[in-house]
């Protein structure tokens, strides 16, 4: 039997250690210097003087130098000579002593020894590296079957692909030599160290006895020139080298020789087999006796091929495979018709004939002598380029004998590329219990006793755990098992992959494995999570089975779902780890062992079943989300200890899954579409499988690869022993074809006919005694009339009452109904104990926590620091729906007495759907500006009233208020008719742009309201749309899909970008402890649907909520009080009589009611003595003056000079009236009206008189402070200058009113009150009138009635606008309030 070989991951080769060696500098000895000239002169002079002295001594007859004394002249002469010839000065100091020179030589030699060791280490690393990739041919036979076999890869990264050793020779080392510094000259060079350095460089510049290689990808052919035996020995060595290191799928060989006996040994090598032709001995051997025969059989090899392209000139890094090596051992001129001078692309020739056709190209010639010395043109080691035109010594040739080659070939013949499973007979007879159902003892799939089935499997912690049959071996028909346990438990897992192209039966195999595991394990022990990147045809049939925790499909549609799925798996690992930690154990196996013992004692523990995660089409996942490879790899590594098993399936596997494949145990590989996919799956031969569904390879390890036929459980179901026609089924008996033994030679051996057993039809799948001849590749439609075995089993499994742990919640695609959400939040139906909630927490949606496997309610807590709520989101993000949901949620959890809502709908009309809720007091929008103003005014008045009443009743906080009013705590509470009140503003910016005055009031409520139970809920596109003073006033925050992620505060902006563009989707921060997560990472949220669950899923109106709540409560939120369209002066007076307020002018002229509190508005002379009124025609300006004059008559005594003075202490009034239209003549009698004018002359005259009167009231100089405060310098009535339609008087310096204008700012000193009306047209130019200008300077209140907003700002940032008759905006310095003027009849 042949053995399969699957290429393992290449082992790590020894690394070449490049070195950088700087040569040391040899010793330097400078030449000696000459004697100074003066020394010679001095010496000659001294010698001469000494000689003269001696001569004189002898001439004088003295005996000083006689006897012993004669020695002194001799010493003097010797001393002078030594002084002259010794080294002196600098020249003498440069001479080196011999001991010192020897020491320095020894030091230099030691340095060379150290460098020699460094260079030798680099050379040794080169030797190890070269011999790793190119071992001696004599060692190859022993290495056959080792992981080193067939390791070359044509991927462009393996630079040794196509490179083959031919001998050993010399190579320059991987050493960079640095020149010595300060190299001495030849004269100064110390000879010993210089010679040593020269010899060191000579011997260390070459590495000896290293493999020498040639490349198949550099030249189109090589000519081996020399003695024939030498050439044949080298060729045999080359063949052995290439067939060992290159697989038969990468390199194939062809021999064309006239001496076929010489090449008989190559029949053993799979590389010589023709993959297209077969004979009785297998693949036909590509050995031919002539060029003609070769061309006839392999002519198509050259069809369409271009010229040979060297590797360094190719545009592609990858090498096309298989590369063909043709050995030319026949001298035939017909070769010229086969190959040109440029060669053939993808083909390398080796010529052994020495024909000139092959040898006339020097760079393609390897010439060797009898001693085996090869000479060739030298090439660059890295680029393979020829660097010299003269042949050099290249190598000592390798040589392999025929005996050695045949031994090598016979050993290699045992191996096929992942074909250990191939036998002569492939058809299998299924006899007895060789199928899944028989293994489990199931006679009738439609009637399974699961209690008995699972009860009989008592070794759930033993060998049978996660061990299930899935098909049959192709060689002997035995039942084949998949054991998903870890390798250390004797299994094939814990994780594995399954691959197969379309039509290979992958989906069927996935179903078979899953259902077989279900049959072997009860749901308490085994759970599945079935995920499919696409439609889920393979896993959808298992819906509702108690083993299945969740079926997840269509993951490829949204990458966020993929990340969510991975998060859920991480959460399951964390959950299981926590369970194990709580029991004090390390892994799931130990935990279940402890649990089993505890249950035997009657004490149960939390279950921890095995979890098989099936991911179909995972390759698509990696394509869409490349980081998933690393994540799944980590999940696989950490999950194995907690019984989490991954089973990955895909149509193809590519290199990007390489890291994940390292952690995969078993591999079920069906037919692959490409060689690359088969290679990546670990079974390269899968590409050669026939197109037969369910046929594949089961790879347990590198050497244990089994060919199998998967069982088809989705076959038609019939009762046992009955065919489709209702007849008794026949028993099928099969035999195996027999082929006679054949003599194995290089020659073609024709197939003989079979001699044993009957012919049988091709069997694709066998199951339970039935023969299934055709099987669909993917999931097929369920039969209408005939049920399937698999579905029959699944239907029975669905009847089991078991609820699995759900580790996957539905994605946030459909919003939950509001009543379902509230029920989930309360833990009981919302109608039960309705209104018993004592907090102000409202659920508005769900939070998706895939890591925790749940979706808790998303709540807004408005009872504490989060009293005000800000809802941020871009346009279309669902802000208005969030408001509807919040209000509906409050309505289902609180009574209308507890919470009330007042809404300003500036975004859309959707909020009007909550208007009928008993909790809602008002819904107003831009089409009802008055309703908007009244709503704000009402709540602002409530804040002010509660400020007062809380002090009065001793209420310290809203918590105390709620306890007293709704919790039964003793103590008084204000009877204002409100509980917690919510001002809801949909689109804060729109309101701010429309009404500057109103938005300031809203801001006041935002800052002050929460302390008194008045909350504000606003929506905005951007946080910057809020006014700066109130941006920090929102303690609760709802972030939907943001218009600008910079506004994100709950999560980091990089997470906020992931919120999908879907209404209602948002994000909150992680609200649980997760050590591996950013605390500001986001959790996705979805706002609930503001409708009851009984309504269709596309209904977002609140009518159903209104109906449901109205059935439980009869209370109603107080409506917003509105100013009446008409309000009489008597009614104002009645209100004024009951008014107890302070500081608002109570007791004065009451002329209107305020919309803030529906209380009277007074002319508060303590603050300002004047009033201006403007508005368009028929707005009620004159009526305003009539009402004020009526009040003057009510409050003041007549003050005209024609009547007697009133009693002391009673104030009196004197009216100076300018009425061009004469409508106010009857408002007051002549006893009040001092002067009256209706034309210019009369006005001028009257103003002169008034000026004289006022001048007389000027305070004289020298008054004391007491006199000034008491205004004792004048007496008399208060003077009211009332001017109607001042626009009819000349403006500017021609205005007759300029005479009285100087006293406007000193009105309090002279008792003057100016009340003026003017039409609104041209108000921007009203400053030219001296009286109006003076009133502006005095900050007189301005009542703007019906006006044109296009006039722009009138005072501050306040504008006018259309108003009903009698209504106006009373503007003070920087505030404004709408008032309704009391109606007084005016003479027409």
UniProtKB/Swiss-Prot annotation:
Instruction: Please give, as recorded in its UniProt entry, the membrane topology of this protein.
Output: Multi-pass membrane protein
Q: Which InterPro entries does UniProt cross-reference here?
A: AAA+_ATPase (IPR003593), EccCa-like_Actinobacteria (IPR023836), EccCb-like_Actinobacteria (IPR023837), FtsK/SpoIIIE/SftA (IPR050206), FtsK_dom (IPR002543), P-loop_NTPase (IPR027417)
Q: Which UniProt keywords apply?
A: ATP-binding, Cell inner membrane, Cell membrane, Membrane, Nucleotide-binding, Repeat, Transmembrane, Transmembrane helix, Transport
MF (Gene Ontology):
ATP binding; ATP hydrolysis activity; DNA binding
The protein's superkingdom reads Bacteria
Membrane-spanning parts: 38-58, 65-85
Primary localization: membrane
Positions annotated to bind ATP: 500-507, 873-880, 1175-1182
Compartments, as annotated in UniProt: Cell inner membrane
Q: What function is annotated for this protein?
A: Part of the ESX-5 specialized secretion system, which is responsible for the secretion of EsxN and a number of PE_PGRS and PPE proteins. This component is essential for ESX-5 complex stability and secretion.
Name of the protein described by the UniProt record: ESX-5 secretion system protein EccC5
Which species is the source of this protein? Mycobacterium marinum (strain ATCC BAA-535 / M)
